Amino acid sequence: TIKIGYVSDLTGATALWGTAGQYGAELAIKQVNENGGVLDGKMLELVPMDGKGEPADSVSAFKNLVEVHNIVAEIGTNFSSCNIPMASVADEVKVPIIGTAASNELVTVDENGNLHPYSFRMCFIDSYLGTVIGNYAYDTLGSRNAALFTVAGNTNSESVGQFLRDAFTAKGGTIVADEQCQDGDVDFRAQLANIGAKNPDIVFVIMNDYAKNATFAKQAREMGIDCMLMGHDGWDSAQLAGEAEGALENCLYVSRIGFSTPEAKAFGEEVAKTYNITMEGECLFGHDGVMWLVDAINRAGSADPQAIRDALEQTDVFEGLIGTLVMDPATHNPSMACAVYECHGDSFDFKEIIEAQ
């Protein structure tokens, strides 16, 4: 049996995501094993371990998987803060790890830009997403005067915001208001007053909490700010549109392709049915993590961790449920197509694909 580790937030506030990823990976492994496994009949086994969404716990979980369970590779976590310290450990123990939604630059390279040879990811990075959003707002939506709203001290929010700002202004757009909140804030009216005074044609709302995004939208509308609100993958929740109670009607966010293809939707529905959970995008990452490792093991002709690492790095094109992944061997960052979602009533519906840039 070939063991694959899975570290994620299986308990705590965000366990919804971690468990969805685990179930996606388990179902993918079940399907692979039913079809004869890998390397002429070897079976796969998933060994999940709770990292609680905390860096220290995630590192301990990964070490345990390597030392006690002899895993050949690891999938997870979905947090950059956890994968950054895990990357150094992966290099030491020479076991490849694949972050799912860990989008900070430092997941695969250190502060000096040196590659972590054993750390990979399956999502686009903050700079890529920020650039895509800035370009789309300028080119496709015709926005020229934008407000930007980010969370102070939140790496993802500030990083996406920075690259979005750079892309939008490089095209000739103007950021007329640049406002921030603290992590725990739920009242955004002071910042919204400043934004409203500048009369932007769009507000970029880069927060990673659907309840806060909904609150922001409702407060903006109450204060007479009725322009387009636009977000990033931090808006990715089935709850957001309903929570916003109409305040996000016709608003957009850009994220991964998610459930917008029939294959992804069918798999999501199968996970939801099999494990009795709601359909969360993280289950697609679990699936694709397993299938990318299967692809790498088969190409390598070996389940040796070093051979798997080499094959992951040399991935020309991997067709997953979250879209087509093209690996950059120099950075271990994939370039991927993104999807635009538009709010109608209680849901965000797939609008269009933005091809990989």
Predicted regions and their residues:
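Short, surface-exposed alpha-helical segments at coil->helix boundaries
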Residues: 19-26, 131, 157-165, 261, ...
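Extracytoplasmic ligand/sensor domains, especially the bilobed periplasmic-binding protein
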Residues: 71-179, 226-252
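Extracellular/periplasmic periplasmic-binding protein-like sensory domains
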Residues: 217-287, 298, 342-356
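Segments of small-molecule ligand-sensing domains
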Residues: 271-284, 294-349
